[in-house]
């Protein structure tokens, strides 16, 4: 995992951007973060949409994080953090604007929130888009500290009221924050209940807008690529 010296500042991070992106439009670099046990390819539709709009490969970052065979082992602390941290720092360093946009799906939403707040990067993020995230917790994980036998539902996990979730609540993530959600999301709306504390769990504190679609958990990612691209331009 990279350790970024805070005194160094981020003003010089895009020194090589012009050389790297000479053939591309000057737009924010984009970081796309998949969900628990997912793959970077989960964002293929988004990637294709961005490419069609003129983004270069060097402007799109798709880190791969976490165990692919043990979803219950993944949380928001430790080895899961490194790939996302590296992608954020590398994206800022290579962005011709000095800023980035980020899009997360499912647990990728909360993992992005963790890294942005932990590293103090919110000032470098223009747009944060959270798709089908459990920003307020998953009822399938129960209420902390109960039903926390797995890492995914533990202290650093997604049980409702977990110390981790309480720690990111209300923290600034970007200049503009949006959520994309569904009332038929089979993961976030476990047992038919989507709300936590009277608010849809995918809604993010301070969001500029929230967009609702009649898709399932993965359909929200796969079938909203144009909406995602619109939000970051």
Q: How would you name each of these model-derived features?
A:
Residues 9-19:
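Bacterial N-terminal signal peptides
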């Amino acid at each position: 995992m990279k350790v970024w010296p805070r005194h160094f500042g981020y003003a010089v991070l895009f020194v090589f951007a012009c050389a790297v992106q000479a053939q591309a439009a000057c737009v924010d670099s984009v970081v796309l973060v998949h969900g628990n046990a997912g793959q970077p390819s989960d964002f293929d539709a988004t990637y294709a949409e961005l490419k069609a709009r003129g983004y270069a490969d060097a402007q799109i970052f798709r880190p791969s994080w976490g165990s692919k065979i043990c979803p219950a082992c993944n949380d928001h602390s430790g080895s899961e953090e490194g790939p996302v941290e590296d992608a954020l720092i590398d994206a800022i360093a290579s962005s011709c604007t000095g800023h980035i946009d980020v899009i997360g799906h499912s647990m990728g939403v909360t993992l992005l929130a963790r890294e942005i707040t932990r590293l103090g990067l919110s000032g470098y993020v223009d747009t944060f888009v959270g798709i089908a995230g459990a920003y307020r917790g998953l009822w399938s994980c129960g209420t902390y500290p109960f039903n926390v036998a797995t890492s995914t539902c533990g202290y650093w996990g997604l049980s409702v009221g977990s110390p981790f979730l309480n720690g990111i609540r209300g923290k600034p993530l970007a200049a503009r924050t949006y959520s994309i959600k569904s009332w038929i999301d089979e993961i976030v709306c476990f047992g038919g209940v989507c709300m936590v504390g009277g608010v849809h769990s995918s809604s993010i504190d301070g969001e500029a807008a929230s967009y609702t679609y009649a898709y399932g958990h993965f359909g929200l990612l796969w079938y909203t690529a144009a909406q995602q691209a619109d939000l970051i331009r």
